[in-house]
């Protein structure tokens, strides 16, 4: 029997010591932005998802650890949140916000687009935290024997079970349509929930959903480079060239020997030694993640930098321009990100990364890192590379270097990772999932949109590509500064849901 976990309140799930590896840096950045938006949304005057005095309810569901084996009686407690302040009856729509690879707080039902849509339909808003993340942790730690119960298929079984259990617990009518919302990996889960359980899930809105698993995600940095040239968000060809120049200088200093490396370490506010090639690759990967993360979350509340600001730094538009260089601009960008996220230094130790990811004890700081690495090794890949000759950044860390983590931490070979990725696409259908009544929403500056659906697959599988929008921006709390294209995109989402809900009312009358 799982032990009920206490609510730990608002935790900024960010390491106090440093950022390490590209993937971990992006996770820290995502968590930082998510927590900022969730905590800000609960203050009066921010967002449009709730009224004064609104209090979300927290609950726990007892779920089977292995839903595919009826003889296994082990269970765990899965956390959910409820916002019923706009609910007008038993047969109203239910908006289910599916959690992804991280913790879910009360803001998951109080802020963002699903919560903002609720008043128009008198909808009930629920969020469901993903197994093995946040406080929805099975007892026993994170060793391999337990991680075998962590997969998208297990998560979907949880969604189906929760949908049925919550209908009874919350007195939801059998005629109420359930609409799944999710962003990024959770957007894929929303799609697949509709695909696998059409009798339980009426429709889905999949935001920035990377439906196609891929081992070598070289297209990520191709989109980053293209987005750095977009004038609408403050980019330019000169900005891209400056970014390339900055990385060339970092690589020159790394090759110049110990003295130059010591200077580089001090100037970047980095912690640790650069003696080992593997640590140099980690540093270059972290710097790429900083640039990529700026593009990925451009313009969002809580993001340390925007593309416009980053390009301004790289091009020396602030301060003494005559003394500025792209490398100096990159240094300033690193300092801004570290300061914004409360970091002591930029970490790049491969040995420390492996040790951290090999720790089987659930951690409050850095929660979810080992779990998400396991899912990339056993289902999705998503290893960002920049190995082509046209890459504007560093060609390190290369794909083999990244795949080594799967072997070092879990004993999984590159061949097994490739096989797992192929099986994922075969099972779900990749970018042609064949699910009806799913709206795919993406932003064209988001590097992940190339793995999603950006053109209509049919009348019941529409796609919406929002100009100049970043990752999951449509799900973020509304702000007065939102662009006209983002506002229009949200209106189109609302209209599509209205059309689908009209159809169900016609069929019931």
Curated annotation (Swiss-Prot):
It comes from the Eukaryota. Glycans are attached at residues 69, 171, 320. Its EC number is 3.4.-.-. GO terms for cellular component: endosome; lysosome. It is found in: Cytoplasmic vesicle. Residues 1-22 form the signal peptide. The active site is at residues 184, 446, 471. Keywords: Cytoplasmic vesicle, Glycoprotein, Hydrolase, Protease, Serine protease, Signal. It is an enzyme of class 3 (hydrolase). Expressed predominantly in cortical thymic epithelial cells, with highest expression around vessels and the thymic capsule. GO terms for biological process: proteolysis. Protease that may play a role in T-cell development. This is Thymus-specific serine protease. The lineage of its organism: Eukaryota, Metazoa, Chordata, Craniata, Vertebrata.
């Amino acid at each position: 029997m799982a032990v009920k976990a206490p609510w730990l309140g608002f935790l900024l799930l960010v390491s106090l010591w440093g950022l390490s590896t590209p993937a971990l840096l992006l996770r820290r950045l995502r968590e930082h932005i998510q927590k900022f938006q969730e905590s800000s949304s609960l203050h009066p005057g921010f967002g449009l998802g709730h009224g004064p005095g609104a209090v979300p309810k927290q609950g726990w569901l007892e779920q089977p650890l292995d839903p595919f084996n009826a003889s296994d009686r082990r269970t765990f407690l899965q956390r959910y949140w409820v916002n019923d302040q706009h609910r007008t009856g038993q047969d109203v729509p239910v908006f289910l916000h599916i959690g992804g690879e991280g913790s879910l707080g009360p803001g998951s039902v109080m802020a963002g687009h699903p919560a903002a849509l609720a008043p128009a339909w008198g909808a009930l808003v629920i969020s469901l935290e993903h197994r093995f993340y946040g406080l929805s942790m099975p007892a026993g730690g994170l060793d391999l024997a337990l991680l075998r119960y962590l997969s998208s298929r297990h998560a979907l079984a949880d969604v189906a079970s929760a949908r049925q259990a919550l209908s009874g617990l919350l007195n939801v009518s059998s005629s109420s349509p359930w609409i799944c919302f999710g962003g990024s990996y959770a957007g894929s889960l929303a799609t697949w929930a509709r695909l696998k359980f059409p009798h339980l899930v009426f429709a889905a809105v999949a935001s920035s959903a990377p439906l196609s698993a891929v081992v070598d995600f070289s297209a990520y940095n191709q989109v980053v480079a293209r987005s750095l040239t977009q004038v609408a968000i403050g980019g330019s060809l000169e900005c891209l060239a400056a970014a390339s120049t900055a990385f060339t200088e970092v690589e020159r200093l790394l090759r110049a020997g110990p003295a130059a490396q010591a200077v580089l370490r001090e100037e970047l506010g980095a912690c640790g030694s650069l003696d080992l090639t593997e640590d140099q690759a980690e540093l270059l990967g972290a710097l790429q993640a900083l640039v990529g993360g700026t593009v990925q979350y451009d313009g969002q509340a809580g993001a340390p930098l925007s593309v416009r600001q980053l390009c301004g730094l790289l091009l020396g538009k602030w301060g003494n321009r005559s003394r500025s260089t792209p490398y100096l601009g990159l240094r300033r960008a690193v300092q801004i990100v570290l300061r914004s996220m409360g970091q002591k230094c930029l970490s790049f130790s491969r040995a420390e990364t492996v040790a951290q990811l090999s720790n089987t004890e659930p951690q409050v700081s850095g929660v979810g890192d080992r779990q998400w690495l396991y899912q990339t090794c056993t289902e999705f890949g998503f290893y960002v590379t920049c190995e082509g000759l046209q890459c504007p950044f560093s060609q390190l860390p290369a794909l083999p270097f990244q795949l080594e983590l799967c072997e070092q931490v879990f004993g999984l070979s590159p061949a097994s990772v490739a096989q797992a990725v192929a099986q994922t696409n075969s099972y779900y259908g990749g970018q042609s999932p064949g699910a009806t009544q799913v709206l795919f929403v993406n932003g064209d500056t988001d590097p992940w949109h190339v793995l999603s659906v950006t053109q209509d697959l049919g009348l019941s599988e529409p796609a919406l590509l929002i100009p100049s929008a970043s990752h999951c921006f449509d799900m973020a709390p509304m702000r007065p500064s939102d662009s006209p294209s983002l506002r229009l995109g949200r209106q189109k989402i609302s209209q599509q849901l209205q059309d689908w809900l009209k159809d169900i009312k016609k069929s019931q009358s």
